[in-house]
């Protein structure tokens, strides 16, 4: 198939997935840059001021300008933590947009989130309300820095997966979210009680639908469970296990097969060992 034919096929799939009617030029731009801008993203960018920091374009509002130095500092921190865990990776361009809760919810299709990352759009969305700027400056980690650390870790993880020649949908969400929570918990004392929440089978929080359902159950905390699982892997097997899992997972050998080979435990036994580790 010619490159023109590939682009036309990509245009058809892009419009089907986004519900839009993108031009051939927009399709080609998204294909070659691996960065698609939705209509909402274009609108938010057009209404924002812009500051460039290395490979990150920061889009912010005038009333949030005081947060830029802290944003740059947090991006440096996120990069240091992510590269420490995952090693080197090509730092492709990424956008970070400050936005209100309504826009964040529209982009993420999730309620009650403070941050969002789309690997398809190559964009991080961070909730910032102008009235909270002074509070953020006083207690930055809980209000502001943690979501940036979390979402940047997603960016780094997906970059590492892409460079390994794999696809993100081969990896369970608890693994992806666990890495992000581990990075976001740096310099933080994590309080946990494995008896406080219902522990879910990891395979039930592997894909999107199961994850969304788990977020709605008051007796569960899939983010904490993901953190505990990834932290266990790091503490017991060392940080290199994350890259090993990424590099060895592929279409013919799935994540759970690789996990069992590395840990010597099928997933059910692995889950029990994680619980026993924290008890």
Each PLM stretch: what is its role?
Residues 1-49, 279:
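N-terminal low-structure segments adjacent to metalloprotease catalytic domains
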Residues 42-45, 108-112, 194-200:
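Alpha-helical scaffolding within the catalytic cores
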Residues 35-37, 68, 78-83, 273-279:
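Charged, low-complexity, helix-prone segments enriched in Lys/Glu/Asp/Gln
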Residues 143, 147, 163-279:
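Acidic/His/Gly-enriched intrinsically disordered linker/tail segments
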Residues 39, 43, 134-135, 222:
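Hydrophobic alpha-helical segments with strong N-terminal bias
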Residues 4-6, 133-134, 178-183:
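N-terminal short leaders/motifs
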């Amino acid at each position: 198939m010619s490159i023109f034919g590939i682009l036309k096929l990509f245009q058809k799939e892009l419009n089907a997935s986004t519900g839009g009617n993108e031009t051939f030029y927009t399709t080609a731009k998204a294909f070659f840059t691996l960065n698609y801008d939705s209509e909402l993203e274009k609108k938010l960018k057009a209404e924002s001021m812009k500051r460039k920091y290395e490979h990150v374009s920061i889009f912010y509002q005038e009333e949030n300008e005081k947060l830029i130095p802290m944003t740059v500092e947090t991006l440096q921190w996120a990069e240091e933590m992510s590269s420490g865990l995952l090693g080197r990776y090509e730092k492709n361009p990424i956008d970070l947009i400050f936005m209100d809760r309504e826009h964040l919810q529209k982009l993420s299709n999730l309620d009650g989130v403070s941050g969002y990352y789309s690997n398809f759009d190559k964009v991080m969305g961070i909730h910032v309300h102008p009235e909270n700027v002074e509070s953020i400056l006083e207690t930055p980690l809980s209000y502001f820095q943690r979501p940036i650390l979390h979402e940047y870790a997603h960016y780094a993880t997906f970059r590492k997966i892409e460079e390994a020649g794999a696809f993100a949908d081969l990896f369970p969400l608890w693994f992806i979210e666990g890495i992000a929570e581990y990075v976001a918990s740096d310099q933080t004392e994590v309080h946990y009680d494995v008896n406080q929440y219902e522990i879910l089978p990891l395979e039930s929080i592997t894909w999107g639908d199961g994850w969304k359902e788990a977020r709605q159950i008051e007796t569960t905390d899939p983010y904490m469970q993901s953190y505990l699982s990834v932290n266990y892997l790091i503490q017991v097997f060392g940080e290199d296990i994350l890259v090993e899992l990424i590099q060895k997972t592929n279409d013919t050998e799935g994540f759970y097969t690789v996990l069992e080979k590395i840990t010597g435990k099928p997933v059910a036994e692995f889950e029990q060992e994680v619980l026993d580790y924290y008890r």
